[in-house]
Amino acid sequence: MTQAHLLVLATGGTIAGVAGSALRHDYRPGQIGVDDYLEQVDALGLEARLVGRQIANIGSEDIGAAIWTRLHEEITAAFADPGCQGVIVTHGTDTAEETAFLLDLTLPTTKPVVLVGAMRPADAVGYDGLRNFANAVRVASDPEAAGRGVLVVMGDRVFAARDVRKVRTRGTDAFRGFPRDAVGLVTPSALDWFGAPWRASEGAQYAYHAELPEVPILYVYGGIGADVAARMTSEATRGLVVAGVGEGNMPQPLRAELVRLRESGVAIVRASRLDEGLVDREPEDDANGFVAARALNPQKARILLQVLLANGIDDPAAIQAAFDRR
């Protein structure tokens, strides 16, 4: 069997974290460099040739536009390299779903791209990072992973970027998918896909822009005042995602303020603060010019809205059509 040539882009996170004790709860993410990490991986005897590149070595709470741009550039270059069969990105778990979704929207599907992380630091009892990484190698080495968009591998399961979400603060089973759960099951020695690849086109869905428009998330809570929306927006704000109660609901005074913002040119998307469930369009959305997030949670709705606005798509109907396709 020919070994796959895979590029490993390291950004830090718990998978490269160290606690200094096998029993401590607190730890420092991003302490192990990619070269040292791949030395540990060599002992596993994986059937792949791995080339590492350090993009950052930080917790994923600090990952944003600059690192997204570097990742996009490196992966684009890897796609143009005929000797590279796939890309693995080691990443902290806190914002992995946002990085994965942004890359999924703006990269072609010609080669596998897999994000992988860990819930326990490298020196903890029951460290899950090496197994997750071995699983990621298995997925990224499989030609059938192409055409499925960007994937996230955690806890012996493979998730699509558009579905994956972190649902627990602790435990190796912290990730789940919605509306689809796992799209595959993986171990270091086996991989089973659920269904055929779903990305019909090999091209990127949208162009990547290094500078994304300002789009805050407004979290709705009991007793929220209408003035909150005005306080969190400025002249630079291009869109706003509402993490509403229930099916994206909000008090009427706040809704009236958001209508005013919409009339001033700010795109408004209604999502839900609940972990699962669809936010469908309602008759009032037509009158208000709002967009329903459908299956996307607030953080992913924000990423999609930023990408759409950066690509010049600002009409509510066109934005809704893009959300309907998710």
PLM regions and their residue ranges:
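A short helix->loop->beta-strand "cap" motif at the edges of active sites that frequently abuts
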Residues: 84, 109-112, 263-268
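Internal gly/pro-rich beta-alpha loop/helix module
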Residues: 115-187
